Regions:
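Intrinsic low-complexity, intrinsically disordered or marginally ordered coil/linker segments
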Residues: 1-156
Length: 156
């Protein structure tokens, strides 16, 4: 199974989440809602980097997803397969969330910290787990918008 996962991850057209929890053809027009409901995120994995694949029974890799971690896909796959265990660690600085999810074959647990509602916990976890230390306060959208209007000369 690990070699199959590795080949999917190495294929530029590979779609690991669809391999884990296949989207029915009948849902192709409703892909957005189906993906969110079944994978937990809107698109499959991108920017995949295989960190370690030395053993036939484990693989470590990092990836990007849109807006949310694909915990639902990993959990459904693990519960259906019976041989799968996982430990996900994730951080999304753009949307300001960080967390983890584990499944050991019997027990599932996850922790999600929203940086907008729990800024201190978010900063602590992102610093401890990801080494991130540069904390900039987000610029208000109105200031960003005003600057864009000015830069494009739309205020004249």
């Amino acid at each position: 199974m690990i070699s199959e996962i590795k080949s999917i991850l190495e294929d530029p057209e590979g779609d690991l989440l669809n391999w884990m929890v296949p989207r029915p053809k009948a849902e192709d027009e409703n892909w957005y809602n189906w993906n969110i409901e079944n994978w937990g995120t809107k698109w499959s994995l991108s920017d995949v980097y295989i960190d370690n694949c030395a053993e036939e029974d484990s693989i470590e890799f990092s990836f990007s997803t849109a807006w949310a971690p694909p915990i639902d896909a990993f959990r459904s796959w693990a519960e259906r397969d019976g041989r799968v265990q996982f430990n996900l660690e994730y951080w999304e600085p753009g949307c300001a969330f960080v967390g983890s999810a584990i499944y050991d074959g019997d027990y599932f647990d996850d922790e999600y910290i929203d940086g907008n509602s729990e800024p201190d916990a978010y900063k602590l976890r992102a610093s401890a787990d990801w080494g991130y230390e540069e904390w900039e306060e987000p610029e208000p959208l109105t200031e960003w918008y005003k600057q864009g209007v000015e830069d494009k000369g739309l205020n004249k």
